[in-house]
Amino acid sequence: SMGGYVSLVASASVAVAGVFLMAPALYIPSWQHQQYPSRAAHIEIVHGWADDVIPVQHSIDFARTAECDLHLIPGDHPLNTSIARVEAIFSGFLERVRSSPQTSNSPGKAGESAPR
């Protein structure tokens, strides 16, 4: 959650090929950043439907705004019961990032892609 927040905030300043977020702690009222621009060409989120730490709606809202992939899977915050599923999703993410002709060197909003 906190790692997802930090990764996404950092990706606004550092060019990265992709950001993989697990139940990211977004839209927390007392935190400094409430908007999340990113230079990452690929952003993907995994969030458990039964998460009682970070509201799943926060990931849904961000995915809609950023136009990124969102995987809502069975499980709570740590997703301990869905590790094989998370591994499969992450492997697919890595393959898409590796095979993408897009670059992450141009600034843009989250989810913005270079033309193919």
Model-derived features: positions:
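Gly/Ala-rich beta-loop-alpha elbow adjacent to hydrolase catalytic centers
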Residues: 1-7
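Histidine-bearing beta->alpha loop at or near hydrolase active sites
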Residues: 73-79
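Post-His helix in hydrolase/transferase enzymes
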Residues: 81-95
